[in-house]
Structures are given as C-alpha cells and as structure tokens.
Amino acid sequence: MVDAPAPAKSPNLEIQDFRGNFDEVSELIQSSWAENAQKPLLYSPEFLASCFEYPGASFRLAPTIYTGNKPVAFIAGFPRTVRYRGRDLRIIVASFLSVSVGQKNKGYGVLLWNELVGRARAAGYDGMVNYCVDGEAMNGIILGCCRMLKLATARFYSTPYQMRLLTQKRASEAHSGRKEEREQDALENFLEGVRPIVDETPLARVWSREEAAWQLKRYGSIVAQHSAGSRRGIVTGYLMEIANAQRTRCLLIEDLLWGTLAAPERETLLHQFLDRGISAGAQMAIVPVLNYADLAPLRAARFRSSPRLVHGYLTIFSGEPLPEEVPAAYLDIF
C-alpha cells in the first residue's frame, strides 16, 4: 500500500482537512484556473457547498494547504459507486485541484493529489477517477503521479461535447399535483430510468435513493420529466455561469434517462427540459457525449459538436479489475 505523504512541517504551511471556507476556496479556484486555455465554469461558494452535501462527502477527502488561515492549494474527492466489469466499486472523483497563482511550480498540486490518494485508500475506497481537459498539462501530471505511486491507471473514456445556444422566450409550464408528489414521482422515475443504463453500460454510476434525491435537488438543479401512458422518462442538469466577462449562464445536462419513451416523446421531454433552463436564465446548453443514451433527440434539437474534449482516467488501487478503455460510460464530469 502506498502511504500518503506526511503533512508539511512548516508552522506556516500545512495540509489540513478543508475547513469549509467556501468563499476563499471559490476565489482560489477561479484565480488558479483563469490561466487555462478554455474558460472554466464559475464555481460559486454555494455550488461548492452543495457538492459537500452529497451523501458521504467529507472535508476529510478535501485536503487543503493553508498558510495561516488562507487556503493556497485545494483538492477534493467525492464518493461515487460505479459498476465496472461486473463489480460495484466505491471510488472518488477527484476535482477542483487548484494552487494559488503565487504558489505554483512548488509541487503543491502533486503533494495534495498524493495526499488525497492516501486518504482515499485509508478510507477503504477501491479507486478514483480524474478528469483532464484535452491539451492541458494535468493529463501528463496525473499519469506521472500514477506511475510514481505504481497505481493501475488507464484512460477509460474521452468525452466530446455537444452544445447549442438557447433563445430567450416565454416558456409556459403546467405543474399538476402537489410539490411533494411531483418530487417523489421524479425520484422513482429517476431510479427506474438508470436501472437499464447500469445493466448495459461498461462503466456506470450506481445510485442510492439518498444520492438520487440529492441529484434532483442540487444547487441550480433543472429537472424535467414526461410521461405518455405507461411510458416515462426524465432529464436532469444544473445551471452554472461561465467565468467569462459576460458571465454566460450555461445549462449542463447530466442525466439523459429516456426510459421507455418513444422517439417523438424523447424530443418532447428534451424541449421541456430546455424550456425550463431558459426560464431560469440559461443562454446555452452543453452535454457530454458518453454513449449511454440515444443522441437522436439532441440532433433534432439542433445540438452541434463543441471543441471541448475531456479525458477520464480510472485508477484501481488494487489493480483488479484492470482499468481499461470502454466504449461507453455513465458518470458525472465536473
């Protein structure tokens, strides 16, 4: 087993559990990522706080380097269960790795990533997933760290994206039934919709009821469901701003759960979802193409290829089952 590196010994610099100071970490992420070639999303304090409300999330899995009371480097791992090669694995998805501009090139990012690996292994996790935008230096850094720690790692999927601009219009929505009934119906619809995806997709996220409930109510959540007789489906996503001068409001599509809907009904569901996003102020929509869902409704809705490409790296701490490339995946990217 690879031991996590010891915390830094300087009295002014040490690795600690994240303290929950979301305002400062939000500023750290934005300033650190501002140098990236592609404009990042604006990870607000409220969005970050909602990520840690996910069942099982812990400040322990968010090692942070503080100088006094100020965070200068940060990373977080969020728990997920995935079914891969017939086994349910508990993994973490590593995200938000950031180092303050004045502290870069000192090895803090590698130090924190290694620390997160050690903490995840000590907590009994089976592996981890890292995402890197195509062309960014992090691709080489992640693979280099995995080789250094002798971790079985493979690029399991490279995710292209599709997007479309959204035209502001008045969208009429009719809601029948009480709010509590709609929420319960959405939860059952969601869990029913993911079941065949988990069975048919080589690497797929497995949801508990509590996790699915979080997904439907997460910060900025947009959800639409549609039924036609006994057929039904649901689409989920959330609203974020892009960290550009215009603060473009972007609707990120997460779960395309067409369920048992027929082709025209899937298009209806997608239009309902986009209308809800427009009503919430969305100016564009973007969706990762993971090949677990029918893409015909996206083509009908005039989605087009985006230049964005994100590589996913799967690490299995024990080496079994061996991580390898898959033709389709169902797992969130952030």
Question: Where are the regions that the model predicts?
Answer:
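Membrane-interface helix-loop-helix junctions at boundaries between adjacent transmembrane segments
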Residues: 102-134, 138-143
